[in-house]
Amino acid sequence: MLSARSLFQEIHDDDQAFRLFCSIAAKGEDQGGWENGRIARLVPDPVLAPKVARHGADEDKHGRIFKALMHKRGLTERDVPDDTDYTMILERQGIGLAHARLRRDEPLTEQDVITYLAHSRVTEQRASEQMLMLKRIFGDHPELGRAVRMISNDEDNHLAFCHEELLRLAYHGHGRAILDTLQATARAEIRTYRDVSLAVMAHLGELLRWPRAKSAALAAGIHAVYAYERAGGWRRMTTLKMPARLNALGGPAPHEQFA
C-alpha cells in the first residue's frame, strides 16, 4: 500500500535516492539563503533588514544540515536536474525578486518588499506543510529526527514572520497590492509544485526501479493534489492572520547545534 511514510522510508533506505532528495533540498535552501542575504542588504528598513538576514541564516543552516545528513552516510552532493529546481522555475515565471535585481546594489522599493514577502508567504506555507509531514514520519528517527524537528520549527518561524510583516504593510495601505501579489504567486506556485513533484518522482522512480503501476499511482496522486489546490486549496496560501509567534525572527539565530 502506498503511503507518504512508506515512500519516504524507501527513499531514506536507498543511498542514491536519499542523495538526490537531500541534494535537491540543499540546493533550494542554499538559493534561499543567498536571496535573503541579498535582500537583507538592500532593504532600507533597519527593523526589517535583520529579520530578513536571520531568515537567510536559517536557510543556509538548513542547506548545511541536508549536506551533513549525506556526509554521515558517506555521500556527496550531486547535480540537481533542472526540472526539479523549484526556486529557479518560479523565478523564470517572474515570481519573487529576480536574481538580476538582487545583484544590483540598489535599495528595494516598497513594492519589491511586498513581492519578497508575498513570495515567502506562499513558499513558506509549502515548506512548513512539507516539514510537518516529515516530522510526523521521522520526528523520532535516530538519524533524521533532530534535523527534521529543527528545520520544521524554523519554517514555522519563517511563515509567522511573513504573516506579521504583510499585515503590518496592509495596515499602512498596501492591502490590495499584497492580495494581488499573493494570488498571482499562489497560482504559479501550485503549478510549479505539481511539475516539480512529477519530475522528482520520475527521477526517484528511475533510481528505485519502480514498476509503471507504482509510478502511475504516484503521478495520479500529484495530479489529484493539484486539482484540489486549483479548485480552491490555493487560497490557504493567500490568507493572513496575526501569528501566535510574534517577532519570530527577532534577535540572532539560536546557536547551531546540528551542522
Model-flagged regions — what are they?
Residues 1-259:
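Non-heme di-metal
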